[in-house]
């Protein structure tokens, strides 16, 4: 086919969509160029047949940043790109979330999306270009997909309001970093980080983005009109009406009763028994459905039962109404040898969160397309299988763990002190020890508590809450503090974190169409009510950061020296600073402007290192008495070391009031003596006296 190109204006940028020139064997391939800043190649491939062995839709999204895109060669021994970075993993999830609900229910053909950043000027984030390219590639692929989608990034300034698709430079001054994706009718996904914005400001940003990315959707539709492949002939399996009716009539009441059991393990055990009974009764014989079909139908009845109960105003699975937060149990300082710790329990969800303080050298080094960066704040989230009572894989963090950790990090980071106020590297680890819904928000609460327990001067405590939605026709119910089952069976996952003053993070994933502005507004208001409730209970345990750091944390001393003294502190080949660190057991970081940070395991170690640095950088003061060591004797006097690296001359005439024939009659090398600084000339040479010390002491020097 001949290449097809569509250009359109998107905010302050010109976007070009091109297909038919590159990657022509893929089901759909689009090259997206934003001005001359970013070029992303997006390909989509769909398997022609479904894999019946998989009980889920096998969609995978792979976003990858090639170092050649920024004119770089990868570091390391192998000199090629390795495992996905955290940024690549997070962007892959960002693209996956809005497209997954738009594939038809029951579609089980494998679909793979690959987004490759092939060129960047390092001025803007390529993620929006990748999302636009994904929408376009799916639209022309012929794969069943209820798109297209649009996407946009939004910044916010108090003076200028909302800004569409800011550059990295513009983002620095913004109090909001939000990505929104959706169709022409509805918002499907929101991911954001903010500096205590109000609920109205956050909702305004979502609606602003939705309005602005309509131009993207229209451009993709125009591209598809010219370049789309024929739509696949696919139809869903007909609903097993008779089977569903049989299960509901005989087991519906028992299933409904099972969902009144408030303890998760007991409820699951009872539902497991019922499922076994249904399978035994309705499958296995000739002419009956297969066991997998019966299990799927049983799951559908569960889904409908829970949703009907909720929208009809009945109590939720654990007996709560729609606005109640589960009971909280909060403890801090639970681990004696850590720097800060908290155990946050909300119902059957529990997080053990630990804060650790380190030196500037402990910061995470990030090798990005924009260059190397150091990140002094890390928040890691771990979700072991025992937290849900299962056996499972143990190993490195998966995509979900990386995503949840980043959400918790976004929630907390705006409330951390500036580096010049608190120059420690901070690592927070959230260990999910029990899970029944909203473990990421438990991590936010636990992280805030652990940081305050560690003595990190937080600007304000932070709490998070997960909201849910069940919508049937015109009826809907918004649920506060959702359980795991409510998350799975509901239509929306809506997580809000913030302080008493405003929102610091908002994440939203919507599975259906028709989520109105009114519903989002109600959900944000209900989330605020819950957040303030949780913050009130947290503040009863620890309302502000401890005034002193844990005795287990390293001591940090900040000081500044003249820039011309930096070489003296470092020494030849780093010998001086290395000796100080080895002898005092402290670590020292020196900046080009002369700023020095000294970290010691103990206060004594840090202070010893500080004194050594002061000794090296101090200048000899005229009229001051020093205790020095005789370094070298010559015919005309003796050289005495009074400060590290600083020797002065005691002339033979300055040794004594009496006549001295030989210097060695008075002094010997290695001897400690008191000397008075008489003068320092413009070349830095120091003139000393021994004979004038007594008179100087008498005069009060």
Swiss-Prot record:
| EC class (word) | transferase
Reading the lineage from the top rank, the first entry is: Bacteria
Subunit comment: Component of the RNA degradosome, which is a multiprotein complex involved in RNA processing and mRNA degradation.
User: Which protein are we looking at?
Assistant: Polyribonucleotide nucleotidyltransferase
Q: Which GO terms describe its biological process?
A: mRNA catabolic process; RNA processing
Record keywords, A-Z:
Cytoplasm, Magnesium, Metal-binding, Nucleotidyltransferase, RNA-binding, Transferase
Record-annotated S1 motif domain positions: 623-691
Of the GO CC terms on this record, one is:
cytosol
Taxonomic source organism: Pseudomonas fluorescens (strain SBW25)
Q: What is the lineage of its organism?
A: Bacteria, Pseudomonadati, Pseudomonadota, Gammaproteobacteria, Pseudomonadales
What subcellular locations does the record give?
Answer: Cytoplasm
Q: Which GO terms describe its molecular function?
A: 3'-5'-RNA exonuclease activity; magnesium ion binding; polyribonucleotide nucleotidyltransferase activity; RNA binding
């Amino acid at each position: 086919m001949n290449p097809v190109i569509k250009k359109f204006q998107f905010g302050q940028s010109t976007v070009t969509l091109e297909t038919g020139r590159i990657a022509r064997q893929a089901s759909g391939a689009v090259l997206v160029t934003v001005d001359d800043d970013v070029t992303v190649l997006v390909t989509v491939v769909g398997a022609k047949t479904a894999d019946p062995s998989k009980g889920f839709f096998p969609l995978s999204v792979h976003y990858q940043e090639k170092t050649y895109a920024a004119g770089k060669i990868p570091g390391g021994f192998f000199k090629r790109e390795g495992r996905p970075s955290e940024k690549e993993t997070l962007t892959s999830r960002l693209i996956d979330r809005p497209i997954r609900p738009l594939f038809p229910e029951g579609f089980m053909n494998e679909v793979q999306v690959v987004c490759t950043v092939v060129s960047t000027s390092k001025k803007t984030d390529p993620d929006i270009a990748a999302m636009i390219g994904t929408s376009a590639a799916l639209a022309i692929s012929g794969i069943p997909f209820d798109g297209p989608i649009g996407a946009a990034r939004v910044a916010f300034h108090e003076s200028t309001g909302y800004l569409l698709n800011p550059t990295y430079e513009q983002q620095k001054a913004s109090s909001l970093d939000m990505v929104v994706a959706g169709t022409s009718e509805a918002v499907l996904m929101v991911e954001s980080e903010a500096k205590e914005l109000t609920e109205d400001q956050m909702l305004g940003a979502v609606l602003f983005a939705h309005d602005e990315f309509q131009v993207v959707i229209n451009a993709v539709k125009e591209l598809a009109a010219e370049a789309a492949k024929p739509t696949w002939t696919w139809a869903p399996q007909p609903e097993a009406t008779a089977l569903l009716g049989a299960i509901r009539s005989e087991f519906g009441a028992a299933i409904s009763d099972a969902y009144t059991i408030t303890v998760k393990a007991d409820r699951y055990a009872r539902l497991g028994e019922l499922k076994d009974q249904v399978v035994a009764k309705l499958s296995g014989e000739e002419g009956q459905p297969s066991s997998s079909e019966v299990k799927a139908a049983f799951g559908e009845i569960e889904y409908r039962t829970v949703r009907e109960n909720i929208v009809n105003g009945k109590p939720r699975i654990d007996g709560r109404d729609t606005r109640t937060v589960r009971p909280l149990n909060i403890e801090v300082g639970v681990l004696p040898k850590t720097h800060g710790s908290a155990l946050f329990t909300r119902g059957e969800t529990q997080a053990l969160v630990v804060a650790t303080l380190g030196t500037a050298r402990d910061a995470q080094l990030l090798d990005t397309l924009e260059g190397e960066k150091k990140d002094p704040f890390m928040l890691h989230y771990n979700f072991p299988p025992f937290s849900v009572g299962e056996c499972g894989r143990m190993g490195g963090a998966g995509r979900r763990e990386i995503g949840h950790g980043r959400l918790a990090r976004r929630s907390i980071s705006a409330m951390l002190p500036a580096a010049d106020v608190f120059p420690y590297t901070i690592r927070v680890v959230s260990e999910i020890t029990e899970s029944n819904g909203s473990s990421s928000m438990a991590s936010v609460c636990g992280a805030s508590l652990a940081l305050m327990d560690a003595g990190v001067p937080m600007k304000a405590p932070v709490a998070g809450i997960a909201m849910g939605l069940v919508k049937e026709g015109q009826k809907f119910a918004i649920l506060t503090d959702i359980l795991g089952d409510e998350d799975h069976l509901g239509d929306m996952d809506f997580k809000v974190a913030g302080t008493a003053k405003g929102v610091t993070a908002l994440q939203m994933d919507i599975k259906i169409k028709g989520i109105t502005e009114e519903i989002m507004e109600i959900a944000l208001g209900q989330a605020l009510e819950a957040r303030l409730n949780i913050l009130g209970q947290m503040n009863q345990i620890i309302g502000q950061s401890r005034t002193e750091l844990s005795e287990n944390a390293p001591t940090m001393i900040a000081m500044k020296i003249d820039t011309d003294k930096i070489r003296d502190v470092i020494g030849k080949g780093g010998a001086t600073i290395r000796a100080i660190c080895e002898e005092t057991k402290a670590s020292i970081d020196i900046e080009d402007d002369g700023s020095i940070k000294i970290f010691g395991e103990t206060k004594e170690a840090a202070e010893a290192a500080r004194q050594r640095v002061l000794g090296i950088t101090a200048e000899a003061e005229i009229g001051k008495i020093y205790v020095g060591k005789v370094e070298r004797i010559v015919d005309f006097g003796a050289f005495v070391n009074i400060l590290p690296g600083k020797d002065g001359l005691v002339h033979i005439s300055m040794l004594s009031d009496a006549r001295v024939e030989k210097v060695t009659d008075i002094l010997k090398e290695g001897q400690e003596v008191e000397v008075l600084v008489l003068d320092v000339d413009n070349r830095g040479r120091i003139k000393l006296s021994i004979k004038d010390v007594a008179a100087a002491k008498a005069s009060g020097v």
